[in-house]
């Protein structure tokens, strides 16, 4: 076991705080409508330009092990907020930095870290309650477009595209974002389906950066039982290899020898393949496999029907233009099923919905109906260069997540105003002075997102924040894009409650851990082995024959 270095107390916290500051300072320049770009060097290809907080955070790795621990903890804030709300990563990072800074000062002044943490938790709980109480629900397509526009850094067309996509496939519908081959960004609705099962092995991934397996123009094998015997699968695998097309296997499970062999073949590059578990359980699994079969023009391989795996031919496999698989979901786009068959299946499910008396069954049938009939909206992102397309795609992904979050929990005034207003409404008291200090830490930290947005726009933060707080109306704030004061919601500057709430909760959670840290342990850097000695002595000056 390698030797470790241990740091305690103040020296540990100082190192950690430095790491937090390096990461947060790089991320927070992207906040707001006048946020700056960050350029990231890539080991191959052109540098990447982004205004996406989590993308910047993921690129930062520090040389000093202790500083790096601090940076990675805050990176975790950005990642977690991104996973839950899909946006608000920069806000979460700014809040975490503010809470850690104030907390470190309080601990250095001799306050009890555990009481500070309790005070922080009390204040956060009250702010969350306040945010949910003043949320406004989103109803119209215009409001959806507004949210999308703001999250896409003020690009109106992106907001309109997202609103149109949500109108076509419903708020819970599947919307995917792809890179286009042209300079224009366009929206297309295709017949598709998404279910909540991800890849069985991360080795199936084709895009390691996004951890996604994409299969273009794929065959789909649908099997209702477990697959563990490789011999039975060989004929169909060989037939697919001959075509040069990728294969998706959907089965109850793929395990043991079968899964290992598929992974090895994928890694060697002989077979483009991915495997996922079939969605649902019991009879519903059979029904959902049948739905996928109808959508893709394939057949479910079932021994009840007398079809053995050994005798499967290519025409029994389904086909789809594109399959996209993440850790949690599989999306099948543009299946090769006949329109008349799909319509027949939809009518059959509608009839079952009418007949059923169970609310649970009705809900599950409606889910199946939405998957079959709803389709998938595809936003194809265009641009003049590859760098521009990637940057725009990041923004559309953010905007899409923000819009979904807004539809779920409603909206509050944007521009950091909602948190700013909540900061003066905190009335909760702790059990002692140290807990009250924790409450005050949150009170001050809640001003940091608004201040950062104003600073990034090149204005004086203290003056702007003071002016906003002078007015007593919840919606009054500052438009950093135009430099005007007014009603934020009327100006279309809004934030989804889910994004603001998640950013605050995640930031407070990780910041509390950092404040209560008393010791840090890291591996000592390995000493380089001594170099090989030079040649034998006394051999200089030999005559060359």
Curated annotation (Swiss-Prot):
CDD domains noted in UniProt: GroEL (cd03344)
Quaternary organization: Forms a cylinder of 14 subunits composed of two heptameric rings stacked back-to-back. Interacts with the co-chaperonin GroES.
Described purpose of this protein according to its UniProt entry: Together with its co-chaperonin GroES, plays an essential role in assisting protein folding. The GroEL-GroES system forms a nano-cage that allows encapsulation of the non-native substrate proteins and provides a physical environment optimized to promote and accelerate protein folding.
Enzyme Commission number: 5.6.1.7
BP GO terms, sorted: protein refolding
Keyword match Acyltransferase: no
Principal location: cytoplasm
Keywords, in A-Z order: ATP-binding, Chaperone, Cytoplasm, Isomerase, Nucleotide-binding, Plasmid
GO MF: ATP binding; ATP-dependent protein folding chaperone; isomerase activity; unfolded protein binding
Entry GO CC: cytoplasm
Pfam families: Cpn60_TCP1
Residues where ATP binds: 30-33, 51, 87-91, 415, 495
Family: Belongs to the chaperonin (HSP60) family.
InterPro entries to which the protein is assigned, alphabetical: Chaperonin_Cpn60_CS, Cpn60/GroEL, Cpn60/GroEL/TCP-1, GroEL-like_apical_dom_sf, GROEL-like_equatorial_sf, TCP-1-like_intermed_sf
Protein name stated in the entry: Chaperonin GroEL 5
PANTHER family in alphabetical order: 60 KDA HEAT SHOCK PROTEIN, MITOCHONDRIAL
Cellular compartments annotated: Cytoplasm
């Amino acid at each position: 076991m390698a030797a470790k270095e241990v740091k305690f107390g103040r020296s540990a916290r100082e190192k950690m705080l430095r790491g937090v500051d390096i990461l947060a300072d790089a991320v927070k320049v992207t906040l707001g409508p006048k946020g700056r770009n960050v350029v990231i060097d890539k080991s191959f290809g052109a540098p990447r330009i982004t205004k996406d907080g989590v993308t910047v955070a993921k690129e930062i790795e520090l040389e000093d092990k202790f500083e790096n621990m601090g940076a990675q903890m805050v990176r975790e804030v950005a990642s977690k907020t991104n996973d839950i709300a899909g946006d608000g990563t920069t806000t979460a990072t700014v809040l975490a930095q503010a809470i850690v800074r104030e907390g470190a000062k309080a601990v250095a002044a001799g306050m009890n870290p555990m009481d500070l943490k309790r005070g922080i938790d009390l204040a956060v709980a009250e702010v969350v309650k306040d945010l949910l109480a003043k949320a406004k629900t989103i109803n119209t397509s215009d409001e959806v477009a507004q949210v999308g526009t703001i999250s896409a850094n003020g690009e109106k067309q992106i907001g309109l595209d997202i609103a149109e996509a949500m109108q076509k496939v419903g708020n819970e519908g599947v919307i995917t974002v792809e890179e286009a081959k042209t300079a224009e960004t366009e929206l297309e609705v295709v017949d598709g389906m998404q279910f909540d099962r991800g890849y069985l092995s991360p080795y199936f991934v084709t895009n390691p950066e996004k951890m996604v397996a994409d299969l273009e123009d794929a065959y789909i094998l649908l099997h209702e039982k477990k697959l563990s015997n490789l011999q039975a699968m060989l004929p169909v695998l060989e037939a697919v290899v001959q075509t040069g097309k990728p294969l998706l296997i959907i089965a109850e499970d793929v395990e043991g020898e079968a899964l290992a062999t598929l992974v090895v073949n994928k890694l060697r590059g002989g077979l483009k393949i991915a495997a996922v578990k079939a969605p649902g359980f019991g009879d519903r699994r059979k029904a959902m496999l049948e739905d996928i079969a109808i959508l893709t023009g394939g057949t479910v391989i079932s021994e009840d029907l007398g079809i053995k795996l050994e005798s499967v031919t290519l025409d029994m496999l389904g086909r789809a233009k594109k399959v996209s698989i993440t850790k949690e979901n599989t999306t099948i786009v543009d299946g090769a099923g006949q329109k008349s068959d799909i319509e027949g299946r939809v009518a059959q499910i509608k009839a079952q919905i009418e007949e059923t008396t169970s609310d649970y069954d009705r809900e599950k049938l409606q889910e199946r109906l939405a998957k079959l009939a709803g389709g998938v909206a595809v936003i194809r992102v265009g641009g003049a260069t590859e760098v521009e397309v990637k940057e725009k795609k990041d923004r559309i992904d953010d905007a899409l997540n923000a819009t979904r979050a807004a539809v779920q929990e409603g909206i509050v005034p944007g521009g950091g105003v909602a948190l700013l207003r909540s900061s003066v409404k905190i009335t909760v008291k702790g059990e002692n002075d140290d807990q009250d200090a924790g409450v005050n830490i949150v009170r001050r930290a809640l001003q940091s997102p608004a201040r950062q947005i104003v600073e990034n726009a090149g204005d004086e933060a203290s003056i702007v924040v003071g002016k906003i707080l002078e007015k007593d109306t919840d919606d009054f704030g500052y438009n950093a894009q135009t430099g005007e004061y007014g009603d934020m919601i009327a100006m279309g500057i809004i934030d989804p409650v889910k994004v603001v709430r998640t950013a605050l909760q995640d930031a407070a959670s990780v910041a509390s851990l950092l404040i209560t840290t008393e010791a840090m342990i890291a591996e000592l850097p390995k000493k380089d082995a001594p170099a090989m000695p030079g040649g034998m002595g006394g051999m200089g000056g030999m005559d060359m024959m």
